[in-house]
Amino acid sequence: MLTAEDKKLITQLWEKVAGHQDDFGNEALQRMFVTYPQTKTYFPHFDLHPGSEQVRGHGKKVAAALGNAVKSLDNISQALSELSNLHAYNLRVDPVNFKLLAQCFQVVLAAHLGKDYTPDMHAAFDKFLSAVAAVLAEKYR
């Protein structure tokens, strides 16, 4: 459960990310593919090389979904319902991969924001990404 303070920090963080979210989404995916190569199996039709337009496009979608969730912090489940259906019923992505991507997104934020990514902000965004991962996995049950 996100507290009022968590929500405030998440919103502040996303304001810092504004203008870079597509690049951060792309970088998080690239990092995931390198760090967890087994995740590539879900993208057999993608060119997964660095700089790939397909990965960049998917990174943009990831960032847009996170932005949508940030705008709907009081109802993340409703905001991501269609995405949850897509990943559970059509794509059949193993839910552990949502956590792997979340971890990679955290690393990208820390690398780019440095001291502006405070420990409190990190903790709040970690809770947020855990909530997003849980919502994306809820249709699997």
From Swiss-Prot:
The Globin domain, residue ranges: 1-141
Keywords: Heme, Iron, Metal-binding, Oxygen transport, Transport
Sequence positions that bind heme b: H58, H87
Source superkingdom: Eukaryota
Family, similarity comment: Belongs to the globin family.
The protein's assembly and partners: Heterotetramer of two alpha-D chains and two beta chains.
Cross-referenced PANTHER family: HEMOGLOBIN FAMILY MEMBER, HEMOGLOBIN SUBUNIT ZETA
Protein name as catalogued: Hemoglobin subunit alpha-D
Record lineage: Eukaryota, Metazoa, Chordata, Craniata, Vertebrata
Gene name, Swiss-Prot/TrEMBL: HBAD
